[in-house]
């Protein structure tokens, strides 16, 4: 009792100090001092989802930039790895609803998906890197892929069972949807890379900046949901992401033409000025900035719709994420859904407005050297000589 009275007779300053420390969390309610408050707070921060997303985002962006500035074969490998991983994750969301044994399901998926992907993607790489040795292989590739697909198709139809038709046919449709879409996206990304590193990296960085800024702005000031099937996306984040993506797009364009950022042999054409008349005034703008504008609009307003489709697909199968490959982000498909559409757009825009198929002497020469053997070139020279002699006569 005496000790309790003594404690109660503590000075007001001591009581105030104790109360302040307790409010700060440095003294627990039972009176013990917590000495590792800072460490506990730091440990709590490192375990948050935001911290994991931040660290992994930095690692992924750094890795992508390193791959992009090195030999193109690394970029080809990245494209193949990402697209195959996305196909696996999309098909994987039907795992519990299919009802087939694991070995039969896996065999059917590989039998249907591999021939389609191989037929659409591998010729693009073979013609670029192995053109001299791949002619015989490419002539027979379509034959091998077709009959491999037919065999898998027959096995799939034979394995259909009553009572499971809906999920089994859903798997069949999802295999074709994912494989065709990813194969086309991979082929377009390879095309973009061959036209210049900038046209491979630039669209991807636009989507990355749009995705990050939409998340940050939405978390900070977002109040109005943007899409009912994706409630975490907000209208404020959508608008803020467009503003930030515009700034990033013009900054990357400026670095490309003025600072040597991902410069290629054909980059000089984008330094040329284009003249416009705006309200009676003559305006001169470098052509790169004109080409950048469509990419900004597609990355900000069109590419997110592929993300909305991915959200709808996950909800249809009652899944939160496509996978758990990236901690804090979900699966690879959750992060790459918008990249698919921008890669396809980039290839169509490049072939339509930038590198049109107008043959020149230099392009024909490069084509001959890339695709013909020494003996075939000598035969071609003899044919051209005979043609020249006939014209002179």
From Swiss-Prot:
EC supergroup of this enzyme: transferase
Transmembrane segments: 49-69, 73-93, 108-128, 141-161, 171-191, 198-218, 237-257, 290-310
Pathway: Phospholipid metabolism; CDP-diacylglycerol biosynthesis; CDP-diacylglycerol from sn-glycerol 3-phosphate: step 3/3
Gene Ontology CC terms: endoplasmic reticulum membrane
Keywords: Lipid biosynthesis, Lipid metabolism, Membrane, Nucleotidyltransferase, Phospholipid biosynthesis, Phospholipid metabolism, Transferase, Transmembrane, Transmembrane helix
One Pfam family recorded for the sequence: CTP_transf_1
InterPro entries (UniProt xref): PC_trans, PC_Trfase_euk
Lipid bilayer topology: Multi-pass membrane protein
GO biological process, one term: CDP-diacylglycerol biosynthetic process
Catalytic activity, as annotated: a 1,2-diacyl-sn-glycero-3-phosphate + CTP + H(+) = a CDP-1,2-diacyl-sn-glycerol + diphosphate
Keyword check for Membrane: yes
EC code(s) of this entry: 2.7.7.41
Major subcellular location class: membrane
Domain of life (superkingdom): Eukaryota
Localization of this protein: Membrane
Cleavable signal peptide: none
Family statement drawn from the similarity comment of this UniProt entry: Belongs to the CDS family.
Record's protein name: Phosphatidate cytidylyltransferase
């Amino acid at each position: 009792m005496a000790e309790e009275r003594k404690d109660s007779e503590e000075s007001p300053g001591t009581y105030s100090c104790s109360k302040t420390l307790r409010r700060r969390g440095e003294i627990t309610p039972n009176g013990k001092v917590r000495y590792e408050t800072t460490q506990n707070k730091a440990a709590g921060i490192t375990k948050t989802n935001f911290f994991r997303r931040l660290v992994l985002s930095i690692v992924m962006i750094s890795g992508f930039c390193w791959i992009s500035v090195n030999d193109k074969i690394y970029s080809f490998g990245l494209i193949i790895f990402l697209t195959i991983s996305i196909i696996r994750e999309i098909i994987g969301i039907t795992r519990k609803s299919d009802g087939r044994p694991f070995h039969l399901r896996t065999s059917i998926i590989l039998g249907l998906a591999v021939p389609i992907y191989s037929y659409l993607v591998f010729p693009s790489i073979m013609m670029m890197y192995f053109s001299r040795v791949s002619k015989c292989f490419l002539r027979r590739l379509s034959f091998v892929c077709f009959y491999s697909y037919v065999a898998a198709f027959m096995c799939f139809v034979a394995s259909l069972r009553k009572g499971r038709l809906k999920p089994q046919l859903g798997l069949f449709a999802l295999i074709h949807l994912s494989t065709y879409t990813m194969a086309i996206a991979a082929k377009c990304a390879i095309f973009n890379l061959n036209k210049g590193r900038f046209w491979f990296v630039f669209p991807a960085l636009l989507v990355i900046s749009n995705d990050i800024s939409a998340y940050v702005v939405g978390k900070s000031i977002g109040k109005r949901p943007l899409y009912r099937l994706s409630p975490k996306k907000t209208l404020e984040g959508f608008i803020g992401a467009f503003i930030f993506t515009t700034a990033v797009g013009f900054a990357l364009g400026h670095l490309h033409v003025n600072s040597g950022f991902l410069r290629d042999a054909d980059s000089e054409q984008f330094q040329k000025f284009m003249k416009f008349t705006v309200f009676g005034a003559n305006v001169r703008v470098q052509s790169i900035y004109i080409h950048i504008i469509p990419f900004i609009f597609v990355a900000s307003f069109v590419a997110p719709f592929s993300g909305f489709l991915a959200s709808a697909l996950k909800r249809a199968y009652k899944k939160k994420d496509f996978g758990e490959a990236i901690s804090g982000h979900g699966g690879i498909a959750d992060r790459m859904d918008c990249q698919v559409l921008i890669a396809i757009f980039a290839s169509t825009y490049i072939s339509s407005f930038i590198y049109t198929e107008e043959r020149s002497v230099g392009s024909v020469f490069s084509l001959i050297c890339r695709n013909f053997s020494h003996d075939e070139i000598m035969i071609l020279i003899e044919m051209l000589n005979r043609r020249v002699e006939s014209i002179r006569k």
